[in-house]
Amino acid sequence: RGLGDVYKRQVYDEFSTYIGAEISKRRGNILTYNARGELCVVGDDIGEFRATGNLQTKFKLLKKDATISAEGYIKNVTPSFYMRHFHSRYFWWDNRDMNMIQQIYAGAKINLESTRTQLSAGIESIQNYVFFNKQGMPEQKNGNLQVINARIKQDVMYRAFGWENEVAYQLSSDKSVLPLPQISLYTNMYLKFKVAKVLMVQLGANMYYNTSYYAPYYEPATQQFQVQDEVKVGNFPLVNAYVNFHLKQARFFVMGYNLGSKFVNPNYFSLAHYPLDPFVLKMGVAVTFNN
């Protein structure tokens, strides 16, 4: 709307009534499960339904717990209100012809306490996926969108030494509407020990990294992320070094943030056109007071 346009107040009144059921077994060492579903029978979202479920089994491996779990859902949902209606000075839309979104997901997870290992994977199919296009307007994709993800988390602990690692793989069947970095990783290496039997010290460094991709642009006017194909983000290691101290009820830290900016090409962005902070030395103190 322009400065000379006349604004008209518009009131929306929506309601929906759902019926649902749930069945679960939360006790037991061999098998636990939970399943629930709901259906909209009256109102603006009539026909909308959600069905979710998960199950888990537990057993001993090398004298420690190991679990295998699976989860999934089927959904048929109406696009959110602000995807259909939004009125502001810079953006204005009324999408009355949007179709319902269908989602089918299946995933599994393995957790091995004996080796400090976690494995997970999942696949999702989305029909009529809604996204924000390059102009910052909501748009609905025709056809299916598939997303595959796999993740492994491996921790190594030996006396004072700790090493935490996590790697994720993601694949989108249509990167023009849902861009994802193909590989993301996090690693954190540290030493944790006591000084004079009272001061806990943690000295270490961590790193975040993801492969380059056309990361979404954040539009402040709508507070949403929209797709773009102008600049790629990623392929830059965000390295931080830190020292944490814990003395009774007091905790304090010193961190060198984004050390990599001192040694490599400063092409570091978290989102399109949103750079990360350059090297910064951070310090902080926290004290817990008991009443």
Task: Identify what each model region corresponds to.
Residues R1, D5-N291:
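Exposed, low-structure sequence patches enriched in small/polar residues
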